[in-house]
């Protein structure tokens, strides 16, 4: 009895950062998640933090700096140049991000950047947390069913 295993196919599958059921369960157990998205809004990476993003200790700005560190136009628009990025405790790849982001500038660019930032904060739990953390379940269901 021989089993035909295509090593290249398996390697490509693993390298494409497929989201496995264990990853979904882990995300649904996490309390503080920040989603990085493609320019079309599809989540690409879930960054997990053990502590809540807060305004009083400026951790929310540090998380924003990390989230947009590869997008200097957004860093400039949101006045985050002098802020040190806060690295996540863990990151889970959800999908491949091979798209270019449009250059954001002016008042409309600022609004788009803020909208993207405010939609990044998610939670997998249902316990009370600040208003800016939205439920993650909808995003995960959209990815798993695609």
UniProtKB/Swiss-Prot annotation:
Induction comment from the UniProt entry of this chain: Expressed in the late phase of the viral replicative cycle.
Q: What does this protein do?
A: Late protein which is part of a large complex required for early virion morphogenesis. This complex participates in the formation of virosomes and the incorporation of virosomal contents into nascent immature virions.
For this entry, the protein name equals: Core protein OPG114
Sequence similarity: Belongs to the orthopoxvirus OPG114 family.
List GO terms (cellular component aspect). Answer: virion component
Keywords, comma-separated and alphabetical: Late protein, Virion
Please name the gene that encodes this protein. Answer: OPG114
Asked if the keyword Transcription regulation belongs to this entry, the reply reads no
Q: What is its main location?
A: virion
Biological classification of the source? Viruses, Varidnaviria, Bamfordvirae, Nucleocytoviricota, Pokkesviricetes
Q: Kindly state the subunit structure of this protein.
A: Part of a complex composed of the kinase OPG054, OPG092, OPG100, OPG114, OPG115, OPG142 and OPG157.
Cellular compartments annotated: Virion
Q: Does the keyword Thylakoid apply?
A: no
> By its UniProt entry, which InterPro entries does this protein fall under?
Pox_D2 (IPR006791)
């Amino acid at each position: 009895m021989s089993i035909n295993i295509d090593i290249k196919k398996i390697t490509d599958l693993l390298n494409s950062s497929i989201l496995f059921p264990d990853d979904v369960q882990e995300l649904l157990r996490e309390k503080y998640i920040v989603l990085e998205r493609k320019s079309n809004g599809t989540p690409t990476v879930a960054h997990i933090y053990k502590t809540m993003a807060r305004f009083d200790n400026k951790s929310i700005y540090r998380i924003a700096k990390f989230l947009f560190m590869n997008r200097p136009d957004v860093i400039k628009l949101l006045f985050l140049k002098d802020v040190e990025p806060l690295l996540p405790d863990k990151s889970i790849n959800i999908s491949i991000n091979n798209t270019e982001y449009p250059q954001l500038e002016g008042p409309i660019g600022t609004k788009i950047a803020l909208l993207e930032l405010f939609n990044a904060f998610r939670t997998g739990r249902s316990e009370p947390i600040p208003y800016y953390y939205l439920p993650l379940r909808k995003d995960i269901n959209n990815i798993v069913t695609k």
